C-alpha cells in the first residue's frame, strides 16, 4: 500500500509534521539552550541553498547529551556540511577530546570554521577532505586497540551507510555508539512505494528501508531508532 496524496504534502526535513509543536519544542527547549556559536552557524546555514542538510537544534542537543553521558573522547564524523553537528560534538567533548571529521567538500566546512574558532574548539578537530571509505579503510589498517573510537556520527551519502557500518563497527569500541542520521527520510520509509519524490530521493529512501531492516537484524549491535529531526538510529556495539 502506498501513501495517500495528503501524505505527500507532508514531506519536509523534520518528521514532526505538526509545525506548531515543532516550533514549540525549538523555542521552548532547544533555542534557549543553544550555544551562541551554534546559533550563529545555524542562522548562516539557514540562508544557504542546501540548508535542508542542517542538523536541527533539538537534534543537536540530543547528540550533545548522549556524548556527555557516554563520556566520549574520540569520535568520527562522516559528512560535515557547514559543521553544526561537528561543532556540537566539539563543544560536548572534554578539552583533550578529538574528532576525525571527513567530508568531500571543504568549502562547506569553511563556512562553519569561524564559529568553531570563536568557540575555541578548533584544536579538537582533524578535518579530512576525502571520500570516507578510503579513509576508513586506512584507519582500519593502522588501528590499534587503544585507538578505537567512542562514537561515530554519519550524515553523508545515504547509499553508502551500509558500507560505512561495516567499517565503523570495527573502528568503534565495544559499548561505543554509531549514529546514522536521516533514517526515517521524511517519514517516507513507512511506505513500500512513495510516488512524487525526486529520483535521487527515491534511491535514498529505498537505501534507508534496506538499512533499517539490516540494522534491526545485525547481532553486532543493539539499536534504538529515534524520531527526532529526520530520524536518528543509535547503534551500540556489542562485540
Swiss-Prot record:
Cofactor requirement: Mg(2+)
EC number assigned by the record: 2.1.1.336
Sorted UniProt keywords: Alkaloid metabolism, Metal-binding, Methyltransferase, S-adenosyl-L-methionine, Transferase
Name of the featured protein: Norbelladine 4'-O-methyltransferase
Family: Belongs to the class I-like SAM-binding methyltransferase superfamily. Cation-dependent O-methyltransferase family.
Span of the signal peptide: none
GO biological process: alkaloid metabolic process; methylation
Upper classification of the organism: Eukaryota, Viridiplantae, Streptophyta, Embryophyta, Tracheophyta
Residues given in the record as a divalent metal cation binding sites: 155, 181-182
Binding sites annotated in the UniProt record for S-adenosyl-L-methionine: 55, 77, 79-80, 85, 103, 132, 157
Tissue: Mostly expressed in bulbs, and, to a lower extent, in stems and roots.
One GO MF term attached to the UniProt entry: S-adenosylmethionine-dependent methyltransferase activity
Amino acid at each position: 500500500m502506498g501513501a495517500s496524496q495528503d501524505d505527500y504534502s507532508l514531506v519536509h526535513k523534520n518528521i514532526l509534521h505538526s509545525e506548531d509543536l515543532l516550533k514549540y519544542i525549538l523555542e521552548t527547549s532547544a533555542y534557549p539552550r543553544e550555544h551562541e556559536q551554534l546559533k550563529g552557524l545555524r542562522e548562516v546555514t539557514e540562508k544557504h541553498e542546501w540548508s535542508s542538510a542542517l542538523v536541527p537544534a533539538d537534534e543537536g542537543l540530543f547528540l550533545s547529551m548522549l556524548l556527555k553521558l557516554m563520556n566520549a573522547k574520540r569520535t568520527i564524523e562522516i559528512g560535515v556540511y557547514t559543521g553544526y553537528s561537528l561543532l556540537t560534538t566539539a563543544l560536548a567533548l572534554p578539552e583533550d577530546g578529538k574528532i576525525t571529521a571527513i567530508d568531500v567538500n571543504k568549502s562547506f566546512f569553511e563556512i562553519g570554521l569561524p564559529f568553531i574558532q570563536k568557540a575555541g574548539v578548533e584544536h579538537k578537530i582533524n578535518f579530512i577532505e576525502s571520500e570516507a571509505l578510503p579513509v576508513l579503510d586506512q584507519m582500519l589498517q593502522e588501528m590499534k586497540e587503544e585507538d578505537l573510537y567512542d562514537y561515530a556520527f554519519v550524515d553523508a551519502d545515504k547509499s553508502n551507510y551500509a558500507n560505512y557500518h561495516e567499517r565503523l563497527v570495527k573502528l568503534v569500541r565495544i559499548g561505543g555508539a554509531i549514529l546514522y542520521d536521516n533514517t526515517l527520510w521524511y517519514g517516507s520509509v513507512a511506505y513500500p512505494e512513495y510516488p512524487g519524490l525526486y529520483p535521487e530521493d527515491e534511491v535514498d529512501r529505498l537505501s534507508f528501508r534496506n538499512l533499517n531492516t539490516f540494522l534491526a537484524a545485525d547481532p553486532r549491535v543493539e539499536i534504538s531508532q529515534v524520531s527526532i529531526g529526520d530520524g536518528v538510529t543509535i547503534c551500540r556495539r556489542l562485540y
